[in-house]
Structure formats: structure tokens, C-alpha cells
Amino acid sequence: MASSVLSSAAVATRSNVAQANMVAPFTGLKSAASFPVSRKQNLDITSIASNGGRVQCMQVWPPINKKKYETLSYLPDLSVEQLLSEIEYLLKNGWVPCLEFETEHGFVYREHHKSPGYYDGRYWTMWKLPMFGCTDATQVLAEVEEAKKAYPQAWIRIIGFDNVRQVQCISFIAYKPEGY
């Protein structure tokens, strides 16, 4: 009798260890453990396929008639106040404002180079010289208005150049021609 009790205890211990090591199947990014469950759990992993729960809200960018110009170019055009705010941010960081314009291709295209990336075939023309020593955002906005008068069918962007590290730190579209 003692041997049967011992063997049944050993078997019971082994089954508890096996149950403790079992891992629930992955059901996406949402954890069901934190919510009370009022229905019976279905442990059949073939019926609980999921793409991750939170992924349901993602959408595909429509490529037709949606040209990409710069970072955040999918947002509506910036108002004058928003432009001034961006320019003040640029100046506050010590970057040199510079205006550039493009009369033909304001969007990404591949003409001379086929690989994607920063060198995407766009070479913009600089408007005058970089505005070294500029401390007023309205001066930059006045230059944008002057460039708009000179080239009304051009895309105009403002870039912030860090002359210490010699890199472009910010770039955004300040003006797009009608119809874009």
C-alpha cells in the first residue's frame, strides 16, 4: 500500500510540474489575463488566429494622388502661425534658416538614381544665401513671401542647417503651388 501511495504522489507531482510549465498560446498584443472572462476559454489554437489586436487600426497609405514631399507632408498645409512656430523652433535650436525652391518636381522621383533613400534625385535651388545671424522668424517668413511672388508655381521649403555639425536638422514645406 505504501508503494502505491508513493507512486501516486510522484505521478501527481509530475503532472503539476507539467501544468505549471504550460504556456498559453499567443493571441496578439492584447492580454486577456487582465480582464475577467465570463465565457469558456477555447484552448484550440487553430481557432484563435490573430494579427495582433492593435494592428486592426493601421491603414495603408493610398499612393494615388497623394504625393509625399517632406516629413509630415500628409498633414494639411501649415498656417502662418504654425510656420512662425516652426521657424522659431528652428532659431531657438541655433540652426541657420535657409530657403529652397523647386519649380518642376516638388515630390520624390527617381531620375538619375534608382535606389530609394535620401539621395532621391531631387536637387532644389537655394533662394539667395542662408540667413546667417537671423534671429527673427518674421524675416524668414518675409523671404518666403518674396520667393512666392518670384516663383508662384514653385514648391518652397525651409530648412534648418546646423553649421557646427554641418548637417540639415529640419526641413518642411512652406508653400505648394495651387492644385497640390
Swiss-Prot record:
GO molecular function: ribulose-bisphosphate carboxylase activity
Intracellular or extracellular location(s): Plastid, Chloroplast; Cell junction, Plasmodesma
Coiled-coil segments on the chain, per record: none
Keyword set, alphabetical order: Antiviral defense, Calvin cycle, Carbon dioxide fixation, Cell junction, Chloroplast, Photorespiration, Photosynthesis, Plastid, Transit peptide
Keyword Hydrolase: no
Single GO cellular component term: chloroplast
GO terms, biological process: defense response to virus; photorespiration; reductive pentose-phosphate cycle
CDD domains: RuBisCO_small
InterPro entries: RuBisCO_ssu, RuBisCO_ssu_dom, RuBisCO_ssu_N, RuBisCO_ssu_sf
Reported phenotype of the disruption mutant: In susceptible plants, increased tomato mosaic tobamovirus (ToMV) induced necrosis in inoculated leaves but delayed development of systemic viral symptoms. ToMV is able to establish efficient local infection but not to move systemically. Compromised Tm-2(2)-dependent resistance.
Key word Transferase present: no
SMART domains: RuBisCO_small
Pfam families: RbcS, RuBisCO_small
Additional facts recorded: The basic functional RuBisCO is composed of a large chain homodimer in a 'head-to-tail' conformation. In form I RuBisCO this homodimer is arranged in a barrel-like tetramer with the small subunits forming a tetrameric 'cap' on each end of the 'barrel'.
Function: RuBisCO catalyzes two reactions: the carboxylation of D-ribulose 1,5-bisphosphate, the primary event in carbon dioxide fixation, as well as the oxidative fragmentation of the pentose substrate. Both reactions occur simultaneously and in competition at the same active site. Although the small subunit is not catalytic it is essential for maximal activity. Involved in antiviral defenses.
Record note on quaternary structure: Heterohexadecamer of 8 large and 8 small subunits. (Microbial infection) Binds to tobamovirus movement protein at the plasmodesmata (e.g. tomato mosaic virus MP AC P69513); this interaction seems required for viral systemic movement.
Protein name: Ribulose bisphosphate carboxylase small subunit, chloroplastic
Organism whose genome encodes this protein: Nicotiana benthamiana
Gene name of this polypeptide: rbcS
